[in-house]
């Protein structure tokens, strides 16, 4: 009876083109008869665990939205690239991607993008596009003292929490900087609208 069950299991496995000696990485052992219990089969219980591959795992919150990482830089900061093939170059951050901790720095890490033509008579184009850099590969840069520094946080007398450069003590989050950034964003929005 046990032999007949094993034969039917092997035939069903072969019809599914599965190996009859393993199931999800766990070996299948035939049901053995205990010498003490004549006629009653004993089964070995084993736990079958499927592991997700590293590239299949996605960090998500319970509501299935992506986890957003905190970054030490913001849009408008002047940074210096500290590693990679663009090492040593200085630029301003134009965009931030919080889900994968990457930033786009103006005129740095340019990649060529080939664009097909839309119409028959029109030729295709080769565009230069700024590619993202991981935020750990950039460091805040002081234009006045020409030095890179880590970022620190402190509370001013008026109760505002600001970021500053640890080496120089220069405050990054001043109101003038934010006003300049907002004006620049308005200008680019007006240019894009026209």
UniProtKB/Swiss-Prot annotation:
InterPro entries: KOW (IPR005824), Rib_uL2_dom2 (IPR014722), Ribosomal_uL24 (IPR003256), Ribosomal_uL24_CS (IPR005825), Ribosomal_uL24_KOW (IPR041988), Translation_prot_SH3-like_sf (IPR008991). One of its GO terms (cellular component) is ribosome. Keywords: Chloroplast, Plastid, Ribonucleoprotein, Ribosomal protein, RNA-binding, rRNA-binding, Transit peptide. GO terms for biological process: translation. GO terms for molecular function: rRNA binding; structural constituent of ribosome. SUPFAM superfamilies: Translation proteins SH3-like domain (SSF50104). It is found in: Plastid, Chloroplast. Residues 1-50 form a transit peptide. Its main location: plastid. Coiled coil: none annotated. PANTHER family: MITOCHONDRIAL RIBOSOMAL PROTEIN L24. Belongs to the universal ribosomal protein uL24 family. Part of the 50S ribosomal subunit. One of two assembly initiator proteins, it binds directly to the 5'-end of the 23S rRNA, where it nucleates assembly of the 50S subunit. This is Large ribosomal subunit protein uL24c. It comes from Pisum sativum (Garden pea).
């Amino acid at each position: 009876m046990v032999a007949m069950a094993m034969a039917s299991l092997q035939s069903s496995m072969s019809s599914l083109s599965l190996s009859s000696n393993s199931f999800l990485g766990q070996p299948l052992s035939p049901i053995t008869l205990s010498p003490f219990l004549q006629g009653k089969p004993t089964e070995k219980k084993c736990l079958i665990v499927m592991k997700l591959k590293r590239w299949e795992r996605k960090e998500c919150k319970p509501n299935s939205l992506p986890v957003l990482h905190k970054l030490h830089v913001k849009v408008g900061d002047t940074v210096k690239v500290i590693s990679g093939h663009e090492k040593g170059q200085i630029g301003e951050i134009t965009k931030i991607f919080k889900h994968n901790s990457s930033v786009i720095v103006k005129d740095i890490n340019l990649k060529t993008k080939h664009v097909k033509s839309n119409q028959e008579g029109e030729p295709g184009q080769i565009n230069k596009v700024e590619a993202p850099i991981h935020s750990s590969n950039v460091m805040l840069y002081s234009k006045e003292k020409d030095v890179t520094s880590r970022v620190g946080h402190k509370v001013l007398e008026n109760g505002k929490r600001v970021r500053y450069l640890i080496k120089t003590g220069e405050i990054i989050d001043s109101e003038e900087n934010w006003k300049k950034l907002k004006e620049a964003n308005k200008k680019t929005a007006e240019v894009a609208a026209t």
